[in-house]
């Protein structure tokens, strides 16, 4: 065997090859506007699969016609091309308020985000609050392109109309 050839049965180790402090990455749309921003105080990169793990990440998705959506969690894993962000532990999704709509906050244990597609989903329990209203369910699909979310099962909630409380 040549010295430069790796043995065929060699198992690649998943060790960090680089670390970054105060990491910030931005992706731009075709018009040069920021589509999303991903920041974290600490990131480890892994050469074996070109993935990264982040501590306390925050992902902010922007649309010109809608308020920003901020997603945070205690941990995240980003795939090699950044197409998928897996967040886990204390995940919070917040849609900023507008003059017409109050802020909306969702909490869940984990969330899989596809930032380029503008979508996310979880199979876990979810709780969403907006002012005094709340809704709970298991499993959720989010489409930031249409500003919609769909809870998949076991849905319960309490809705207070803004008109009724004014």
PLM region spans:
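Mature-chain termini and adjacent capping regions
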Residues: 1-166
